[in-house]
Structures are given as C-alpha cells and as structure tokens.
Amino acid sequence: MASILLSLNTHTLLPLHTRTRTTKTTLKILRFSHKLPPSSPFYCNHETRLHLRCQTTTGTPSAADFAAAAGQDRLRKVPIKNIRNFCIIAHIDHGKSTLADKLLQMTGTVQKREMKEQFLDNMDLERERGITIKLQAARMRYVYENEGYCLNLIDTPGHVDFSYEVSRSLAACEGALLVVDASQGVEAQTLANVYLALENNLEIIPVLNKIDLPGAEPDRVCKEIEEVIGLDCSNAIHCSAKEGIGITEILNAIVERVPPPRDTAAMPLRALIFDSYYDPYRGVIVYFRVIDGNIKKGDRIYFMASEKDYYADEIGVLSPNQMQVEELYAGEVGYLSASIRSVADARVGDTITHYSRKAEQSLPGYEEATPMVFCGLFPVDADQFSELRDALEKLQLNDAALKFEPETSNAMGFGFRCGFLGLLHMEIVQERLEREYNLSLITTAPSVVYRVHCVDDDIVECSNPSLLPEPGKRRSVEEPFVKIELLTPKDYIGTLMELAQERRGEFKEMKYITENRASITYELPLAEMVGDFFDQLKSRSKGYASMEYTVVGYKESDLIRLDIQINGDPVEPLATIVHKDKAYSVGRALTQKLKELIPRQMFKVPIQACIGAKVIASESLSAIRKDVLAKCYGGDISRKKKLLKKQAAGKKRMKAIGKVDVPQEAFMAVLKLEKEVL
C-alpha cells in the first residue's frame, strides 16, 4: 500500500492511501483536520468512500479518475432539508457571471485547470457582450458543519427582454443573491428583478461586489439598498468575486438563510420547466425543477400546457455538465431528454406531470412568449433565401420566442418578417444569423404591433406598415405603451426628461432615492423606444443612467402611414408608421437622405414622402444632361432646336417607362436613418 499526494484544489494537499487492483482502484479519503479546511467540498468523515472504476496498472489515480470520483460525490442523494435552490440577481456588468464562476471553483464543481471566464455562458456572443442570454444551472456540493449540502445555482439573464425567463427561474428557487456593484449602486434592472423575487417570496441575501475597487463605497450602497428596496443590509456580505474575497461567507449564508424546499415527494409529479434547448442528436433537452413528487428514467410524462406526452429516455443533474441519474425527487433540479422534436412542445414555464397520474393543477405563471418588436430580414444575395429560412428554423428550435413568416418586397425580393421579445433579442438573432450561418442581411426599421379598429367593427393587428388599412377603412389605431423607469444622477435629470418628452412621453412621477440619485417614471409608446432611445439615454447621461420598462397595454394614438415614392412608385420597405406630429420631419429627413444616395439618371427623378395621396415632403434628383449640340458647329438655329426637342421627347418617354434602381447602400443608409429619426 503506497502513500501518495494528490492536489485536490488550489489550497489543499490530501494524503491518499490507495489499494491497487488490476481493474479497480478504491480511494479511501481520510479526514485530516490540519490539512483540509471544513469548508472544502472534500471534507468528509471516516466512513466516506468514493469508488471509481478505471483501467490502471500503477495504482496511482489520474486527474480524470479523481474528477470522476468528485462527480459521483455530487450525485449522492441528500435529505431534502439539505437542498438549497438559489439564483443570482444583478444588473448588467455587476459581476454575476464572475461570482458564479468563483462559486463553482470554490466548491470543487469545476477544477481550476478547466476554469474559464463566464463558465456558464456557453455562447461566444455571451462572452463578447459580457451578458447572459441563455439560462444555465449547476449542482454543487458543499460541506458545512460536518454535513453535506446540495446547492443548485440557477443562472438567469439580466436583460429586460428576457424578464419572463427570469421570472420562471425565480419560481424554481427559494432564495436569491442580490449582487450590487459597490461602486455604482442600485440600477434599474436590478430593481425590476428584485421585485420579481419578492413576488415569488424568495429569501434575498444582499451581496456588495467589487469592494476591491478604489471607488467602492459599500456603506453608501448599503444605505441605498435599504432606502430604495427596503431590504435590511445589516448582514450584507462584502465580497470581490474577482479576488475571491468573501466567497466562503456567501456559501455559508446560502446554507444558513435560504430555506430548504417543501417535502412534497408523496404528491403527484409537478415539475417547472425553466429552460430548454435543442440538441441535434437527442432532440430538445429540458431543464426543470421538481416541485412535487418524483420522476424516474423511463416514466411517461405529460406537458400540461402543450398537451404532449413523451417517455423520459434520460434524466440527470447539471454539475454543471450533464450527469445521468435514475431518479429525481421534490426540490431537486435536473434535465431530461425524451426525443422531443420542437422546443414549442416544452416551453419555459410549462408543468411536467406523470401521464398516468396527472396533477390536478399546473404550476401558476405560465405565459406564451409574445413578440413585441418586428422587422424584415432580407438576404443581400437573393440566392441565400433558402439558407436564411433554414437558419431561422434552426434558431427557432432553441428560441420559442422567435417568430417569422415569409415576406416579399418589390425592392428587396424575398425575405422574412420576424418577431422578437425586444431590441436586444433582435440584435442577438441578427448577429447569430450573420456569424453562425455566414449570411449577409438587410434589416428594415423595427416596428411594433399596432391594433387597428376598422369601420366594419373588425380589429386587425398589424406589424407591417405596408399592410396598414387605408384611412377610409379604419376608425382608430392603438399602439403599445410602456412604463419606463429611469435611474439617474441628479445632474442629468433635465436632459433625460427632455429626451422622454421628445419621444411623446407622459410624465408620471419623480423621486429622489438618495441625495444624488433620482428615479423618473414616464409612460411612452414602445415604438419610440425601438429606435435609438437607449443610445440617446446613455449619451445624454454620459453612461450613468439606467432604465427598465414594462408593457402597460394599448392606447389610441393619432398614427398615420408614411410612404416613400421614387419616380411615382412606392418603395414598400421604406414605408413606416409615425405619429401625425412627426410626419413632416421624418418625411423631410428621408427624402433628403435619398437624394444624396440615389445615382442621377438620364431624366429628372422626384422623391416624395406621402400620406395617402398627399405629398408632404419632396426632393428632385436632377437629370444628367447630354450635350446633343456638341456636333453642331454653327449654321441654322432650327437644327439645334430640332435636336433639343428630340432629346426632351426622349427624356419624357424615358421618365414614363424608366425604372430607378435604388442601390443596396442607399437602402441600408436610409433604413439606418429611419431607426434614428423614428
């Protein structure tokens, strides 16, 4: 029997006694108090045994063997009183993903050599933008006061576009870490997610991150949290996720303060889906939290909202990689594979139950994903239309909120009208299409869903400006409004109020949350936000202001359709719906831009902005004049007049039958301008 040393983590060397066999190595981990801190995930009593099978002839376990043993240790069933389900709430760039990385590392869930920044963020796009787009989950094992605990971290996106996914993640937890940057303080989106957490009755643990920064003011931020949110910060944890300060205190607080799940194992199965994604080999993989009952491999399961049933081919836990188990009980978090073909069959927020013993009621809070922002996507190369369709279908397998339908334009050919949750969602989908599928795209100006009340009492929902009914056929038009909350330093209150009023905002209230920061609330049309509102907000506040919005419903507005005509022909992709008061300024800006960009023709080209048959703004592109008199060296004037008359007749005929080709660059520049001026 040989005595060897194995490095368990960054700070511990543990003597191991090994017993060599040809095909089986048994590791007996002994407890050495002076060597191994009690907070370590590998701290255990004398009876603990980790068995692993490996092909070995030397008796010395490899790093892979040890990782396998540690993984099996995390799979061990723990009593429900020792389970803790929690998530992390934070504004963008307040250190949520860094803290999650450090928790995974400190609990030994991920070895240091495997560690990379934003470990739970799998997409390159997430790492580049520094945001979380898709949810992830991780099961960690942590030993506290000689007792093993199972900690389930459910990662959440922080952006307002994904607030529904955040709400379903919170519903799968009993507690939340509220992470606030100690140098910046409370931000608008943090506030919105905290209110969601309070609605779900979660135990909230305040964590002040980035205390190592020179500008950190933890005492001021504590006071701000107490005043703005109303949370007691006397026991707030000060930490630096980057430097690893305060991580042990956070883990201890999760065990001490987050309540365990209710013991409802005897009830019929009810499991909440908080995420799903499409795997090309196994179909849809569903992430879920078991609320009541238990689920076994091979069970016939039923999705209560989609009314579909499947057999659970594989179930397991996320640690953070998928590890198979035979059964999951109430309170546990895991995944399942059931050869599901479409993400639409297993939507976020749906309830899983047994087919033979259905639950009486589904879990509350399920909503269909409703697109709020629409735009047209057209391939620059018409030959890429089928590739664009295939790419959208593949993205939709992973993203049930993405909607699309074919659209045809005289100017840009065949494309798709796509619906998104919000502007960030739209940008992410466009970037993924271009990056992952090598497509070159033209996007039309984003629009929202308008509700049109027609004279025959029909109600039509319209997201495409070119499909808006004629003025004589509609009685009124309604548009979606949002309630927007701006958090800003007091120096920028005036300029941000001016911005909101420029965008048809209706002032609701303003309050000072601290001596130097204010919260301003407005109601304004969603259409006014889908342009450059966020860019203007950051520009006018020098980056210090933040915002959060919620849709409050539809209101009637004085809206009209503004058409652009070139040489008398309407250009459908440039049509837009605007408020009557802004029609002239938008029309003038678009016609002037087109005049700069369209190449001159052999005949005069009028560029007009029209409301119905009425022209409200017009520019003319002067003709290229060919010198037909160049070959005349004098002589009779009638010869020159005849040539000029013939040229004028030709230009008149050309103007009647000629077509003006709007170059691709002009389209892209004007569409960009539309996004800015609307």
From Swiss-Prot:
Span of the transit peptide along the chain: 1-43
Cellular compartments per GO CC: chloroplast
Residues bound to GTP: 90-97, 155-159, 209-212
Disulphide bond pairs: none
GO process annotations (BP): positive regulation of translation; translation
Domain tr-type G residues, every copy: 81-262
Annotated InterPro entries: EF-4, EFG_III/V, EFG_V-like, EFTu-like_2, G_TR_CS, GUFP, LepA_C_sf, LepA_CTD
PROSITE patterns: G_TR_1, G_TR_2
Thylakoid in keyword set: no
Molecular function terms, GO-annotated: GTP binding; GTPase activity; ribosome binding
Entry keyword set: Chloroplast, GTP-binding, Hydrolase, Nucleotide-binding, Plastid, Protein biosynthesis, Transit peptide
Pfam families: EFG_C (PF00679), GTP_EFTU (PF00009), GTP_EFTU_D2 (PF03144), LepA_C (PF06421)
Catalytic activity: GTP + H2O = GDP + phosphate + H(+)
EC number: 3.6.5.-
Leading EC class: hydrolase
Localization annotation: Plastid, Chloroplast
HAMAP family listed in its UniProt record: GUFP, LepA
Family the UniProt entry places it in: Belongs to the TRAFAC class translation factor GTPase superfamily. Classic translation factor GTPase family. LepA subfamily.
Classification via NCBIfam families: lepA (TIGR01393), small_GTP (TIGR00231)
Function (record text): Promotes chloroplast protein synthesis. May act as a fidelity factor of the translation reaction, by catalyzing a one-codon backward translocation of tRNAs on improperly translocated ribosomes.
Protein name per its UniProtKB record: Translation factor GUF1 homolog, chloroplastic
Species: Populus trichocarpa (Western balsam poplar)
